[in-house]
């Protein structure tokens, strides 16, 4: 399945009207920012920092999202890897290993990223205490999610919007590790080919098929 870092990234999106603070709950405001987007493409810069401040990893990523469950996350540098799902099957392709791992995709078991990707944010209030910072600028919004589960890997999750655009996601782990995703050059509601989310397996590579029959 997706790594913990990957399952808590990605799929936040944009809306088409400027931010306007209302009496809505933070959960409702976050949902409003997500619900109007059907597709999103962006380049993502990933930075992972250890508890002592040392940089563990810097990555360049290409991301495509298509509701309800299309997800494409390709790490370009430093180590090529592709994770893609069409909502039924998940492929994890590692070209350096000449291997693809295939699994069932079950959005009901997915973590935060899949909920946000599909716009299913209703359960967020059951899993997180959601706050919003309103004092950082007229066109800025930062949502802070505090896990209610004491066994969560994360201390907090910050989701930042700049006016109508998703700016970044910041994960603060309990072990002191911090992960930052910076979203650049977003393209919203542009047509994406459905085949983008169906991985075509190259010839000559190893196939590890972990799918379980749904019958």
Where are these regions (language model features)?
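Gly/Pro-enriched, hydrophobic low-complexity segments
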Residues: 101, 125-130, 134-211
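An acidic-aromatic
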Residues: 62-112, 179-180
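Short, solvent-exposed helix-to-loop capping segments enriched in aromatics
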Residues: 109-125
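Bacterial N-terminal signal peptides that target proteins for export
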Residues: 1-8
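N-terminal signal peptide c-region/cleavage motif recognized by signal peptidases
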Residues: 16-17
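Short hydrophobic/aromatic-rich beta-strand segments that constitute the beta-sheet cores
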Residues: 44, 71-75, 90-93, 145, ...
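N-terminal mature ectodomain segment of secretory-pathway/periplasmic proteins
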Residues: 25, 29, 34-87
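Boundary at the C-terminal end of the N-terminal hydrophobic targeting segment
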Residues: 20-24
């Amino acid at each position: 399945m997706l790594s913990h870092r990957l399952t808590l990234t990605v799929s936040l999106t944009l809306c088409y009207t400027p931010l306007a603070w209302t009496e809505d709950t933070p959960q409702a405001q976050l949902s409003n920012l997500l619900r109007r987007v059907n597709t999103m493409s962006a380049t993502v810069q990933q930075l992972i920092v250890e508890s002592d401040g040392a940089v563990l990893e810097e990555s360049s990523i290409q991301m495509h999202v298509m509701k309800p469950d299309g997800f494409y996350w390709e790490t370009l540098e430093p180590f090529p890897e592709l994770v893609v799902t069409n909502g039924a099957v998940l492929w994890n392709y590692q070209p350096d290993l000449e291997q693809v791992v295939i699994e069932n995709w079950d959005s009901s078991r997915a973590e935060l990223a899949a909920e946000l990707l599909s716009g299913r944010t209703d359960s967020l209030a059951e899993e997180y205490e959601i706050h919003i910072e309103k004092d950082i600028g007229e066109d800025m919004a930062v949502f802070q999610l505090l896990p209610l589960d004491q066994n969560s890997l994360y201390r907090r999750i910050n989701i930042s919007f700049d006016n109508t655009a998703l700016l970044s996601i910041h994960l603060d782990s309990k072990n002191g590790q911090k992960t930052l995703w910076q979203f650049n050059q977003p393209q919203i509601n542009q047509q994406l080919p459905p085949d983008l989310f169906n991985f075509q397996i190259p010839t000559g590579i190893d196939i590890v098929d972990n799918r379980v029959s749904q019958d």
